[in-house]
Regions:
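Periplasmic/extracellular, small/polar-rich flexible segments of pilin-like filament-forming proteins
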Residues: 39-146
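N-terminal alpha-helical signal peptides/signal-anchor transmembrane segments
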Residues: 11-15, 27-45
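N-terminal single-pass transmembrane signal-anchor helix
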Residues: 1-19, 23
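Outer-membrane beta-barrel proteins
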Residues: 18, 22-31, 146
């Protein structure tokens, strides 16, 4: 009985790490694919979801309907032009996924990282992310420099 519980605990831990890593991979992939769509004048204020879907830029594991891209937690992912850069917003993230995503992608390469209502410029540390990811339905937005 103890052995079964230990195996189940390890399986859950492995699944949780895989799940969180996948969210980082998905958002990182969308950032890279959107950078490939940059016009000479930047991104304007356009919604890039449909362009990413039509270009086949979404990983096969990512669901979408029309121009709405869904994340693994039931929230949505939006990619919208922000002048010379663009913003990727990921909604309804658990505390764990919020912290992991913000810490992994909230780097000095971003113009800003917004977690719920708090904005950060530069690197987002684990401590900063932990203080900002306060619910089980967090929103993280990354705005690129270009």
């Amino acid at each position: 009985l103890v052995m079964i519980a230990a195996v189940m605990a390890l399986a859950y831990l492995g699944y949780s790490k895989f799940y969180a890593t996948n969210e980082v991979t998905i958002i990182s992939n969308l950032i890279n694919e959107t950078k490939n769509m940059r016009a000479s004048s930047g991104y304007g204020t356009s919604d890039y979801n449909q362009a990413l879907i039509n270009a086949g830029a979404l990983p096969s594991s990512v669901a979408y309907s029309g121009s709405t891209i869904s994340n693994r937690s039931g929230g949505t992912i939006t990619v919208k032009g922000a002048g010379v850069g663009f913003t990727v917003t990921d909604t309804m993230l658990s505390n764990k996924d919020c912290i992991n995503l913000a810490q992994k992608l909230g780097t000095s390469e971003m113009a800003s990282t917004k977690i719920n209502s708090q904005s950060f410029t530069g690197e987002v540390t684990a401590v900063m992310a932990t203080s900002a990811c306060t619910t089980d339905s967090n929103t993280v937005a990354f705005t690129t420099k270009s």
